[in-house]
Structure formats: structure tokens, C-alpha cells
């Protein structure tokens, strides 16, 4: 199903409407000084999205006074601002997603530090992305709960489009977290293998005077590998928690995407019904044409024409022989 993004055009119209101000004429200035009434700005029944849609007028003038010279300005529905905010949150989440991918790559690289700073950065980015996704999900529910009936089709289409974007973003984040989790577990297994090898070597008989120094070096490596394993275990637990949160978000968004597929199926069904109806109408039209050609009225008209022709011949013969 082809779509067109008219967001930039809509924002251009909205900004041009916001920049409109009521002109201060000399008469209005005189009225302000004498009567204490300022310039009047009214909000009347004008809409960018639906010309038949009316909005409640808002005026700064007192009851009973004339609104002559007032400028009428129309505002879009409230759900448009909500959908725009959701789009901004999705864009921010995409930016944070790119930063999270770089942080994952940096954290998985071998380094001499403890990696706490990288882990803190990953945790912060994951929490921010999850917060943006949950916030967008709640706003989507608000978008479906509010709005007039005449704009319901437009609102539902916008809602389904945003829900699809959110679902794709959640799937991408879930994939990144799963990949990061697998690589963390792989590094943990490699560290355990190294620890076992060092433990075996520790109990071998030493043949030179540097055996004690080697054992101390091996013990320090074992302790360091144990600390790394504990840190990796914490990272794995945090990644698992974030994946569970994403699973809940995916569960909530799946209903909206299923509705979109249902509507597409309904459109196909309606198109098939229209094609069947058109074929039936064509058959009825052909039947009516055949009935009109061979009907009783046509036969009567033909008989009358023949009789008129015969009477004309008789009249001519009468004039000739008489």
C-alpha cells in the first residue's frame, strides 16, 4: 500500500498559521485607550485536514462587543500534536540505537580497564531507548482513545503507521540485545576455559627457581578472570531484563499491526465484491437492452409504421385513378 509523507507540508502550514497576528489599526488603538479593550483574535471553524470540521471559537473580546476586524485562525486537531511527538520520540530512539551499537562494539573489545564506564553507558542508553518506546506506546493508546469521528480514518492510518515503526524499532533493539548477550556469554565461556587451564598448570611441579613467581602470576590472572566473569554475569542479567521489557512492548504493539493486516484483507474482500457487483450489473444491462429491442412497444411501433405506409400508398392510388 503506497503512502505519502506530508509531514513537512503540514508543519509549514502550521508554522505559517502560528505566525499570524491581529493587526493593530488606529481605530483599535483608540478603542483600547478609551474602552480598555485590546485586539481581538478569534478561532473559528477552519481546519487544514478537514474543511467540514468545526472547532470551538476562542475570542478575547467581552460578550456583546463587536468582533469586526478580527482574524480567524484554525488549529489542527489535538491528536496531530500527539502523533508528531511520537515521531520525534521514534527519531530520538533511532539515534540512541546507533549509539548503543557503537557502545556494544566498544564494550566487547579487549581492554586493560575494568569496563565499568562502557557498561554504565550501555545501561544508560538501553534505559533511555526503553523509556522512549514505552512513552510512545502510551501515546499511541491515547491517540486511539481520543478524537472526533470524522477524523477517525486519518487518525487510525497514522496510528497504524507509527505502530509499525515502533514494532520495527523494538525488533531491532531486541536483535541487538540478543547478539550482545550471545557474545557476552561466549566471552564468559572463554574466560572459564582460561581459568581451568591456569588451575591445571598451578599444580604442576616446578623445575626452576621461578616457580613461585609463576604461581603468583597465575593466581592474579585467575582472580582477574573471576572478576571479569562476575561483571559479565551482571551485564547478562541487565540485558535479559531489557529484552523482557521489549517483549512486553512487542506484545502490545502486535495488536495494532494485526488490525492493519485485517483492514488490508477487508479492502481486498470489498474489491472482489465490487467486481462481482459490476459483472451482475453488466448482465442486467444486457438483458434490459435485449428486452427493449424485442418488447411489445417496439412491435406496436413497427406495425403502426407499416400501416401508415400502406395508407399513404392507398391515398396516392386514389388520387391517381379518381
Curated annotation (Swiss-Prot):
Q: Which InterPro entries does the entry link to?
A: SNARE, Syntaxin, Syntaxin/epimorphin_CS, Syntaxin_N, T_SNARE_dom
Q: Which residues form a coiled coil?
A: 116-146
Q: Name one GO biological process term.
A: trans-Golgi network membrane organization
Transmembrane spans = 302-322
Q: Which CDD domains match?
A: SNARE_syntaxin16 (cd15845)
- Give the subcellular location: Golgi apparatus, trans-Golgi network membrane
Q: Where is the t-SNARE coiled-coil homology domain?
A: 226-288
Cytoplasmic compartment segments: 1-301
What Gene3D superfamilies would the database entry show?
Answer: 1.20.58.70
Its family?
Belongs to the syntaxin family.
Q: What is this protein called?
A: Tlg2p-like protein a
> What organism does the record attribute this protein to?
Arabidopsis thaliana
